Amino acid sequence: MILTSFMLMMIATTFTLYLASTPIVLGVNILMMALLLASTFASFMSSWFAFLIFLIYIGGMLVMFAYFLALTPNQQISNFNIMPYALITLLTFSALTYTTNIKIPTFSDISQGNSILYMSSTAPFLILLALILLLTMVIVVKLTSRSSGPLRPFSP
């Protein structure tokens, strides 16, 4: 049950990535995703592996965060409206809790090796992870706005 709630929280934070208007809000959102991912790994793998994943994830995020801060002007976070975040979280929890039959692998299932990944009972879990990655990629492409060219122009 805890792994299901972690996955639902990761989905909700993925959906709220697009609502981030400033780099600070985006950084906090990605930090929450890193904490959820590390806690998920710590719950059914080793805590050392979760710690390493967290450090790698945060290190990459800090580089990107510093780059975006250098490109964007200082913006004030004003009129922060929590309603879109709450609505997306509520819809995600209610839809996935009542309509799906996702089996999250337990520690005893993991001892079977990599064959657990290809079982039919874990197919919705893999599709869900792939959709999270796809949605994150689309959000990053939308935020960088391809039509405006490169983030930093090349100057020889």
From Swiss-Prot:
This is NADH-ubiquinone oxidoreductase chain 6. It comes from Lumbricus terrestris (Common earthworm). Its main location: mitochondrion. Belongs to the complex I subunit 6 family. It catalyses: a ubiquinone + NADH + 5 H(+)(in) = a ubiquinol + NAD(+) + 4 H(+)(out). Coiled coil: none annotated. Core subunit of the mitochondrial membrane respiratory chain NADH dehydrogenase (Complex I) that is believed to belong to the minimal assembly required for catalysis. Complex I functions in the transfer of electrons from NADH to the respiratory chain. The immediate electron acceptor for the enzyme is believed to be ubiquinone. It is found in: Mitochondrion membrane. Its EC number is 7.1.1.2. One of its GO terms (molecular function) is NADH dehydrogenase (ubiquinone) activity. Keywords: Electron transport, Membrane, Mitochondrion, NAD, Respiratory chain, Translocase, Transmembrane, Transmembrane helix, Transport, Ubiquinone. It is a multi-pass membrane protein. The chain crosses the membrane at residues 1-21, 24-44, 49-69, 77-97, 121-141. It comes from the Eukaryota. One of its GO terms (cellular component) is mitochondrial membrane.
